[in-house]
């Protein structure tokens, strides 16, 4: 496998409960390096652009409201097969279905407040990274 980069968000439900360090520890324990990270507060308009792919879904407005409700932590992770590894560490979207030891099983409050977001493919990762980070911010 090749070294990849992927994008991750620590969502408002997790930042509000001061779980950034605990989540980062799980990511790093899985062999992922954090090569860029910043804490930001999205506007609803910024969340709407980022999640535009879900615009026609019934949860879209609620998702945008939630993502703009509190600060988030956006990150670029790097490692061997980083996209798949990050998704494995995150666990299933629904925390009730997530495997033991995953971020969502341990920290998520519900399917909506599920603590983390991660890119699902290489193209998506590149787009999501570019939305939040300039090339100068990516170190590693």
From Swiss-Prot:
<keyword id="KW-0418">Kinase</keyword>
<dbReference type="GO" id="GO:0006183">
    <property type="term" value="P:GTP biosynthetic process"/>
</dbReference>
<dbReference type="InterPro" id="IPR023005">
    <property type="entry name" value="Nucleoside_diP_kinase_AS"/>
</dbReference>
<keyword id="KW-0963">Cytoplasm</keyword>
<protein>
    <recommendedName>
        <fullName>Nucleoside diphosphate kinase</fullName>
        <ecNumber>2.7.4.6</ecNumber>
    </recommendedName>
</protein>
<keyword id="KW-0479">Metal-binding</keyword>
<dbReference type="GO" id="GO:0006228">
    <property type="term" value="P:UTP biosynthetic process"/>
</dbReference>
<comment type="similarity">
    <text>Belongs to the NDK family.</text>
</comment>
<keyword id="KW-0460">Magnesium</keyword>
<feature type="binding site">
    <location>
        <position position="87"/>
    </location>
    <ligand>
        <name>ATP</name>
    </ligand>
</feature>
<feature type="binding site">
    <location>
        <position position="11"/>
    </location>
    <ligand>
        <name>ATP</name>
    </ligand>
</feature>
<keyword id="KW-0597">Phosphoprotein</keyword>
<comment type="function">
    <text>Major role in the synthesis of nucleoside triphosphates other than ATP. The ATP gamma phosphate is transferred to the NDP beta phosphate via a ping-pong mechanism, using a phosphorylated active-site intermediate.</text>
</comment>
<dbReference type="GO" id="GO:0046872">
    <property type="term" value="F:metal ion binding"/>
</dbReference>
<keyword id="KW-0808">Transferase</keyword>
<dbReference type="GO" id="GO:0005737">
    <property type="term" value="C:cytoplasm"/>
</dbReference>
<feature type="binding site">
    <location>
        <position position="104"/>
    </location>
    <ligand>
        <name>ATP</name>
    </ligand>
</feature>
<keyword id="KW-0547">Nucleotide-binding</keyword>
<feature type="binding site">
    <location>
        <position position="93"/>
    </location>
    <ligand>
        <name>ATP</name>
    </ligand>
</feature>
<dbReference type="Pfam" id="PF00334">
    <property type="entry name" value="NDK"/>
</dbReference>
<dbReference type="InterPro" id="IPR036850">
    <property type="entry name" value="NDK-like_dom_sf"/>
</dbReference>
<keyword id="KW-0546">Nucleotide metabolism</keyword>
<feature type="binding site">
    <location>
        <position position="114"/>
    </location>
    <ligand>
        <name>ATP</name>
    </ligand>
</feature>
<dbReference type="InterPro" id="IPR001564">
    <property type="entry name" value="Nucleoside_diP_kinase"/>
</dbReference>
<feature type="active site" description="Pros-phosphohistidine intermediate">
    <location>
        <position position="117"/>
    </location>
</feature>
<dbReference type="InterPro" id="IPR034907">
    <property type="entry name" value="NDK-like_dom"/>
</dbReference>
<dbReference type="GO" id="GO:0004550">
    <property type="term" value="F:nucleoside diphosphate kinase activity"/>
</dbReference>
<dbReference type="GO" id="GO:0005524">
    <property type="term" value="F:ATP binding"/>
</dbReference>
<keyword id="KW-0067">ATP-binding</keyword>
<feature type="binding site">
    <location>
        <position position="59"/>
    </location>
    <ligand>
        <name>ATP</name>
    </ligand>
</feature>
<comment type="subunit">
    <text>Homotetramer.</text>
</comment>
<dbReference type="GO" id="GO:0006241">
    <property type="term" value="P:CTP biosynthetic process"/>
</dbReference>
């Amino acid at each position: 496998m090749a070294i990849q980069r992927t994008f991750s968000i620590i969502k408002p439900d997790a930042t509000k409960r001061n779980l950034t360090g605990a989540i980062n520890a799980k990511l790093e324990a899985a062999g992922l390096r954090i090569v860029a990270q910043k804490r930001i507060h999205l506007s609803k308009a910024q969340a709407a652009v980022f999640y535009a792919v879900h615009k026609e879904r019934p949860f879209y407005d609620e998702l945008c409201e939630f993502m703009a409700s509190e600060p988030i932590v956006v990150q670029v992770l790097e490692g061997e097969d980083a996209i798949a590894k990050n998704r494995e560490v995150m666990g299933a979207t629904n925390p009730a279905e997530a495997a033991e030891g995953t971020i969502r099983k341990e920290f998520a409050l519900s399917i909506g407040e599920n603590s983390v977001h991660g890119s699902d493919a290489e193209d998506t990762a590149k787009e999501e990274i570019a939305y939040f980070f300039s090339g100068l911010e990516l170190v590693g």
